[in-house]
Amino acid sequence: MVMIKWMENKHKGRNGSSHDFQVMISIIKNGTSKEGAEKRAVAVRFYHSKEKEITNTGRLQIGIDEETERIYFASASGTKGYKLSGSKKNVRVVQFMPDDLSKWESYVGGYVLQQDLDCKLFYVDISERRLV
């Protein structure tokens, strides 16, 4: 089972307002989280320093290899302007994908995530904060 939790932060700084948010991806095995099941979680932070609300319709692509418990991320089309970061041993942050999907081959991360990984793929809708 995969769970997603959102955390948002709005603040004003020297360069104007900033709106960032973090998405926590959890893999839960052997029961529910309330039952103390084994859980592997990782946080990924998006941030946008421009004076814009996050109304983007882009999607974040998540690949989960349940056997090795590694989590792979790549931004999907429409998420330009956001930076993706993750820093855990079981996480591999993959490069941003171009909007033009025909150019994926030149973006190694997107190509690897689509073609070479034996993992389940999920998408998070950024504007609606949910799995799609």
Q: Where is each model-derived feature located?
A:
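Long, compositionally biased stretches
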Residues: 1-40, 56-85, 110-132
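Low-complexity, intrinsically disordered Gly/Pro/Thr-rich segments
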Residues: 100-114
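Short beta-strand-centered segments at strand-helix junctions
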Residues: 38-55, 87-104
